[in-house]
Amino acid sequence: KFKTPGSHGEPAVYDIVDEIVTGDVTSPETIAGICKGIDIVFCALGLTSPDARHTSYDVDYLGNKRILDQAIEEHVSRFIYVSVFNQDKMPDIPTIKSHELFVEELKKSRLSWAVIRPNGYFSDMGRFFSMAQSGHIFMVGEGDKKINPVHGADLAKVCVDAVNGDCREIPVGGPDIYTFKETMELAFHACGKTPWITQLPMWLAEGGLIVTGLFNRNLADLMSFAVEALKFDHVAPSYGTRHLKDFFAELAAVKH
């Protein structure tokens, strides 16, 4: 599967890496020795979809800590971790709590470190494109909050550049700022469709979280991050040269 680009546009890597190891951080035996012979660790591990067996704590904290423990044991020279932007505005969200617990562990580890905080990925906005293709998008809230998401390749360069320098946190956004509603409209235009967006009040989404939590706590925890993030702006310092409009156009070309 590493010989072809991934579903979010990530490049094939089979011919540019020395070794590929597949493991499960919730099964420690599968990642034993993962940092042996490694100088620098780049870690972007996180739970992004519902899992019936594992929580954000299991993956975002414990899973990352298992990698960190081995990095400490192997005396790696630097540990680069990709976390979340605006974490201070969402401290009670389970996903954020787990990521930030790990950030605390990293800072206490005595390893040289950097924490990268992207505000949103083009691949996240790609979900709007998928919905726009169906001809209709449900939008939670008024869609007036702003974001400047970043392309994965531009974020990768920020991570590599963070190898040198002091221990620090780096907030990262892309070159273009849109409201959430504007990103949806951009997706519709890329599909060649007239925007059809139905607004759902925030109270309805929050009520849905409560009901969902009665049946599926893990799903509700992940959804709570998505809902909470729609309540404020996510504008971070601009990095990179790739534009969301072009990303949507590329998705449209593939679909055709």
Locate predicted features.
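Glycine-/Pro-rich loop/turn segments that contact NAD(P) or position catalytic residues
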Residues: 47-133
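Glycine/proline-rich active-site loop of Rossmann-fold NAD(P)-dependent oxidoreductases
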Residues: 123-130, 161-170, 193-195
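NAD(P)H-binding glycine-rich loop region in Rossmannoid oxidoreductase-like domains
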Residues: 5-66, 70-73, 88
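Substrate-positioning beta->alpha
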Residues: 63, 140-163, 168
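Terminal hydrophobic/aromatic helix or amphipathic segment near a protein terminus
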Residues: 182-231
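Non-catalytic, hydrophobic alpha-helical segments
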Residues: 41, 155, 159, 172, ...
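Substrate-binding strand-loop-helix patch
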Residues: 146-153, 172-190, 203-209, 242
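Amphipathic terminal alpha-helices
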Residues: 229-256
